[in-house]
Amino acid sequence: MRSRRGATTSYILSKKVGFMFHYPHNHVEIRDAVAKLCTDFDGKYWQACDADRAYPSAFVKALTDAGYLSALIPEEYGGLSLPISAGAAILEEIHRSGGNAAACHAQMYTMGTVLRHGSDAQKQQYLPSIADGSLRLQAFGVTEPTSGTDTTALRTTARRDGDDYVVNGQKVWTSRAEYSDLMLLLARTTPLDQCAKKTDGLSVFLVDMREVRGKSLTITPIRTMMNHSSTQLFFDDMRIPASSLVGEEGK
């Protein structure tokens, strides 16, 4: 099993560069277990999802039940406390098996913002539910129609109003928003012309979309060549609790 993924690759590299290259632990047991799980979701399953523009709910549930989507979450919050290389191995194996990890990869890495920058209360409230799959954190609202790679030019605003923030603006190419309970949202809390640096004045929020979807949040699907669940989002005086702020305002 090692020779198939680890030693064989190392041998090929050694022939090219003239010395033996040793990979770190390649998570072979995890890869084999993920590959076995993926046999229940063959090409016909993925073709049907694409044909129907459907979200692979059964596949995501199977990954969640097996604990793979909580791989990077610490054990104290119900996760597996695995390193980032293990997360990469899981996603690689899904793709190697013919699946589509894009349907669920955000559940693994987006939570890192909460883990590294969230308050203790936010971690206790959200991470255990993200770990067991009862809450989906699949969406990350960053890109806008007028700001793609230049994130500092985004126009979505979040204005403090008492115990809330009021959000107005638009996001585009936000994947899986229709199938997510929570969303990380990047918005400007201080006008750009009032900031010493253009990277200042931006804040991150953890939005519970269940509370605002269909009211002050409108989600419109974008049809693309691939079944990637892309959407555009419209915020119309969307009111969220001040406790939704992750980390320090403007930083």
Regions found by a protein language model. Name each.
Residues A102-A121, G148:
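N-terminal glycine-rich flavin-associated loop
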Residues A153, V212-R239:
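Flexible, small-/acidic-enriched active-site or ligand-binding loops
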Residues M238-K251:
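Long, acidic (Asp/Glu-rich), low-complexity accessory segments flanking structured domains
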